[in-house]
Amino acid sequence: MLSKIQSLGCRGVTGYAVSVECHVSNGLPGFDIVGLPDAAVKEARERVRSAIKTNGMKFPVSRLTVNLAPADTRKAGTLYDLPVLLGILCATGEIRQPPATAAFLGEVSLAGEVRPVTGALTMALAAEQIGLKELYVPAGNAAEAAFADHVTVYPVENIAQLVHHLRGDRRIAPKTAPRLETEPRFPVDFAEVKAQENVKRALEVAAAGGHNILLIGPPGAGKSMLAKRLPTILPAMNRAEMIETTQVYSVLGLTTPDDPVVRTRPFRAPHHTVSNVAMSGGGSALQPGEMSLADNGVLFLDELPEFSPAVLETMRQPLEDGSITISRATGSVTYPSRFMLVCAMNPCKCGWYGHPSGRCRCSPRDVRRYHARVSGPLLDRIDIITEVPSLHFDELRSTTVPESSAVVKQRVETARAIQRERFKGTSCRCNANMQTPELRRFCELDETGALLMQQAFESLGLTARSYDRIRRVARTIADLAGSESILPEHLSEAIQYRTHQLIQN
């Protein structure tokens, strides 16, 4: 007898349909799974056999063949345990064939419990696109999968519960999507940072336009402290961003039933010893790396020159495209990587170059060699470069209360609202994403601005990419000021962020 159970597969953040075909025939007892299964899929034979017997049902003593179609696509993971088990029960007449619009996925324990799998949200979204109406998933994945709008998600705790449901004895209650918390709470605040008003202004501009930023200053100046507070002024994630980022985290199994969706913008801060694979992703399973885990959030690289040159150069393409494609002999996977790059570094190897105390002992050649660890093409992709000076004692003792993150965030959200209206109907999300058509339309300079830009271009030796990035930053500064056009003062501030000695070297 032949049965067919609908299931799903997941490769990266892309889901696809998989049909699990089970055939029971006369012959010597055997249990074969075909259709390019990996080791975990092949091991399903023992898990399924034990689960069926443990729950008081008969396992066929005959020839049993399971095909995972399409047979030319490699199948990986334990998510096919549940559809294989149901296919066997249907083929032996234990239960009726489920409707073709229902899909099943989940790992099965020897006792028949249904355990969570990775990539549940991606497969739920794929089920929605395919046109499936019902999705049966492990209870631990149900809250995550329920964010697919037009699919009814049923949480399954064990196979006995599912069998009773399919027989019509006791129905499983569908899972509803949990309520999203719109205002994230942070344990840190900009109000905790004394002085550094110029740096805070640069971070506000970066947050308002989604610009990449580099902080340069001596040890103890507060570079890391300021960078870690950047997420507190970023606008809240919308539903589409939450789902996109959650898909990446789900691939690694980083979601939980209590926290099924990524609600706050990620802040990833890998150590400077991070490997190329850990940063960009890869491995035998083609898993996402730090750049993808920072999607719709912040990727913070402290001690930038200490990172491997290969790691830094890998970032150039994702910074431009907002995605990264990992290719191996087994295939290729594309992950989103729309992140804000925030970097911090000392001005020289010892960290005290240019400090009023005169503590630096680095020669000009040493300073240039240290700066050269950050390549020109990577610097070209950083919109804002600003110095973080050491604080004076009177600044530390000041009783003036700095602006809170909530106040700064209001200005940032106002500027982002202007950008959403401006880019309605386009692929741009913020000013940092503007391409040539948008730059021509929204970043036109008047005669005074054009002359100022020409002087800066010639005196600073700017590239065409730097020219475009200055105009993007100027557009953001104008948005923060509520100006429809880019004025000379907006352009001057944007140019100021490209005049650091690091660029000149």
For each predicted feature, which ranges?
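Basic, amphipathic alpha-helical bundle interface domains used for macromolecular binding and assembly
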Residues: 34, 40-45, 60, 67-77, ...
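Catalytic P-loop NTPase motifs of RecA-like helicase/translocase cores
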Residues: 111, 301-308, 351
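Short loop/turn elements that form and flank the Walker-type P-loop nucleotide-binding site
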Residues: 59-62, 98-99, 129-131, 149, ...
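Conserved inter-motif catalytic segment of the P-loop NTP-binding fold
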Residues: 239-275, 282-283, 389, 429-437, ...
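Conserved alpha-helical scaffold flanking the Walker A/P-loop in AAA+ ATPase domains
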Residues: 204, 261-266, 276-299, 331-332
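Walker A/P-loop
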Residues: 215-256
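Peripheral, non-AAA+ core regions of ATP-driven protein-machinery
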Residues: 1-214, 218-224, 327, 467, ...
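Walker B catalytic acidic pair
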Residues: 296, 302-303, 314
